[in-house]
A protein has these predicted regions:
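Outer membrane beta-barrel transmembrane domains
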Residues: 80-81, 87-159
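Outer-membrane pore/translocation modules
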Residues: 1-85
Length: 159
């Protein structure tokens, strides 16, 4: 399997500057050494991105709307031994009311090789909190260079 290692830096906070801005640096390892298995982003790579978000409080401590955008740089090894570089982008809107949230996200990246390296996705997720358990269901649709759909059902336990 692959391993992601990342670190996030909070650059600005909404409380002090009117907007949350963070930066992330990440490294992705790969579990193979065969170039033939390097399809799209299945091999080792790294990325840097920056995200900005603003939270609009609708009902204090109960309801909020969050808008965010991100952009970055992605680099990975391809199946021909070269590396591909791409510009990453994303937009997200989410709404939270008490313990329930709904979010939609549009994003992807555009590489320079122009061969299977410009996927876009649209994801929507509904989640709810019951005690210390978070239940979620989501749907993801792929466009351009990622012609797949996913239905995601999950749970998390907050310790």
């Amino acid at each position: 399997g692959d391993i992601y290692v990342s670190t996030d830096f909070m650059l600005l906070t909404q409380k002090k500057h009117g907007i949350d801005v963070s930066m992330r640096a990440a490294l992705k390892t790969a579990s193979g050494n065969d170039y033939a298995t390097a399809r799209y982003y299945d091999n080792a790579g790294y990325f840097f991105d920056t995200a900005a978000a603003h939270t609009f409080t609708i009902i204090p401590k109960r309801s909020e709307f969050i808008l965010s955008a991100s952009g970055g740089f992605l680099c990975w090894q391809t199946d021909n031994g070269r590396q591909n570089d791409a510009v990453m982008y994303g937009l997200r809107a989410s709404y939270r009311y008490k313990g329930v949230s709904f979010s939609s996200e549009y994003g992807g990246y555009v590489g320079w090789e122009k061969e299977g390296d410009a996927p876009m996705t649209l994801k929507s997720t509904l989640s709810g909190k019951v005690g210390n358990i978070v239940l979620s269901i989501g749907h993801q649709i792929g466009f351009r260079d990622w012609p797949f759909q996913q239905l995601r059902i999950g749970f998390a336990v907050n310790l």
